[in-house]
């Protein structure tokens, strides 16, 4: 169980307790695609999800994912307690995505239905990213058999949460403690490299630890405008965000169109030094300086803007003949 969810286990209105859990920073985005402001939940899995992912979860059947509306449906005490005990998206994803391979990217909010379906099935129904000792497999069987297996899996995972809550460790191979969330808005690219006959079909991939997120593909566009938000959980021991741009190819491997390491330490250090940003007016609180060994085009300023800690970043893509990228980062502490 995540530390900040522990206090939600006290008696009270079920819907109020669920709403309180939903308001935690890591639950403000969909557990599966990162879409903002999810209003649905899988009560037996313990995650908050968006409307599009909700449709896929429903198609899996209630024996795999029991979907409830946070605001419209009635929740039983058992369902509420289960959600509280798991602690929300960050805790659940550290289990269900513990062994997410580098070759598999989480879908973004705007992916097509087929991509969304493939990822969610692999994550929950096929259990492809679970720790091997938690996986439960069977041959072809009935829905009743599948329901039993999924129930057994849920019990094993819940037992693991209970056991590790007391020891303060949770699946050392896959579970980490998070210190906050990093919202990255990929704004636009400029003069990107040509990888097809006369253009490219670019998309951006972000990597942090075991997390891998990507934007939508922009067809035949060397100056794409995404304005797409991606949300990363930041562990206690973090490194730079690895950014890569690829050209999407239908019949062959996607071609690299440049890369860059984004140093997030200046943002996090500045944010933690000032504490609650809502106590301050708009002001500059830090800076990531341009140097010969980083991809910055200009110094990157860190500001408090409307009670939020944000950083504008303009980078020149590395190891490629041309291309620049503009993005914005925002820091969201877990205790916000």
Swiss-Prot record:
One of its GO terms (molecular function) is zinc ion binding. The lineage of its organism: Eukaryota, Viridiplantae, Streptophyta, Embryophyta, Tracheophyta. Residues 15-137 form the Arf-GAP domain. The keyword Metal-binding applies. This is Probable ADP-ribosylation factor GTPase-activating protein AGD13. Its cofactor is Ca(2+). A zinc finger (C4-type) spans 30-53. The keyword Repressor does not apply. Keywords: Calcium, GTPase activation, Metal-binding, Zinc, Zinc-finger. It comes from the Eukaryota. Residues 162-280 form the C2 domain. InterPro entries: ARF_GAP_AGD11/12/13, ARFGAP/RecO, ArfGAP_dom, ArfGAP_dom_sf, C2_dom, C2_domain_sf. One of its GO terms (biological process) is pollen development. Ca(2+) binds at residues 249, 252, 255. PROSITE patterns: ARFGAP, C2.
